[in-house]
Amino acid sequence: MTKKIFATGATGYIGGDAIYALLSASPEYEVSCLVRSGAKATELVARHPSVRIVDGTLDDLELLEEAAANADIVCNFAHATHEPSVSALAKGLARRQRPGHGYLIHTMGSGTMIYDDVIQRRFGEHSDKVFNDVEGLPEVLAVPDFAKARGAENAVRDVGVKNPDRVRTAVVCTGSAYGPGRGLVEYRTSAIHELVRCTLSRGHALQVGAGKSAWRNVYIRDLSDVFVKLITHATNDEQDSDNTDESVWGGSGGYYFVENGEHVWGELARAISDEAVAQGLIQGGDIESIDAAEAASLAPMCNFFWGCNARVEGRRAARGLNWKPVGPPLVKELEVIVQKEAEKLGLS
């Protein structure tokens, strides 16, 4: 029986690349995508003629629940903090009548791990603390629910715990994604791109405080490979491992930090500055130290992105899915990222 997949966020950067990777690998899937824009729906179908459009938004909760109930695999690539929509998807999967397990794959960032820095108002400082998604998972899940994303995450994990014979779940926490997307969005506005934009518009690079905070990152196509591997595993409805450290799906496992590198924000600022100078876009190589409040005024939430530590280590994808990232490191993509931001600013 052909598996039915329902996806939200398919016109975005992460979701768009994942759908491209999935249908390139397995065009036989029956994929339905929630899309609110008629123009984007037309463009998505033009790229993927087999995709069925579900016209609606994340606020159409009954629509989401019904779509999930009629699917085998639900992929939430949309708003990670929109708890009502995630809960509706979970509720729909819990009542589905199709044979086999229903699967819910939820995407979010790794920003929940900045809790200590935020509470202590510690910005731009180094932290030795590194979270991992296998042996360290209990510690990860014990981080207080201060972030809006935690509510949606808990809704995902709860439906799997309460319905173990019917629903399996995976939470995919991505590092800062970079690289050219193959969906409708080639490059998204991320904290990395915002740092480049501010560097070009101000004529010099900047960092928060001492610039020693660090964040993990991941090449977009390597990230999509994780989604394809999860969906393939779900399609086969394979038996999950009883070993918590190797389990693919929720309960005691099913939690993934997906990353293939780390950037220290001050070091990244220097690399951006060097690239911008090399392209003749700025004159000097000075790096300005700013405080968290100014960072927030320059780019939304970038006081947290540029100033806090989200140091995580992904182990589960390699163990449970045999995932091996092969994409170029972030520094190799800076030339193109700087060029793209310069074009947006009319500098090239």
Curated annotation (Swiss-Prot):
Oxidoreductase listed as a keyword: yes
Q: Which pathway does it operate in?
A: Mycotoxin biosynthesis
Q: Extract the GO molecular function terms from the UniProt entry.
A: aldehyde dehydrogenase (NAD+) activity
Question: What keywords were assigned to this record?
Answer: Oxidoreductase
Give a GO cellular-component term.
Answer: cytoplasm
Provide the phenotype resulting from gene inactivation. Answer: Leads to the accumulation of a shunt product in which a double bond is introduced between C5 and C6, thereby scrambling the existing stereochemistry at both positions.
Which cysteines are disulphide-bonded? none
Q: Please state what class of enzyme this protein is.
A: oxidoreductase
EC numbers: 1.-.-.-
What is the protein's known function? Oxidase; part of the gene cluster that mediates the biosynthesis of UCS1025A, a member of the pyrrolizidinone family that acts as a strong telomerase inhibitor and displays potent antibacterial and antitumor properties. These compounds share a hemiaminal-containing pyrrolizidinone core fused with a gamma-lactone, giving a furopyrrolizidine that is connected to a decalin fragment. The polyketide synthase module (PKS) of the PKS-NRPS ucsA is responsible for the synthesis of the polyketide backbone via the condensation of an acetyl-CoA starter unit with 6 malonyl-CoA units.
Describe the family membership recorded for this protein in Swiss-Prot or TrEMBL. Belongs to the avfA family.
Q: Spell out the protein name for this chain.
A: Oxidase ucsJ
Which species is the source of this protein? Acremonium sp
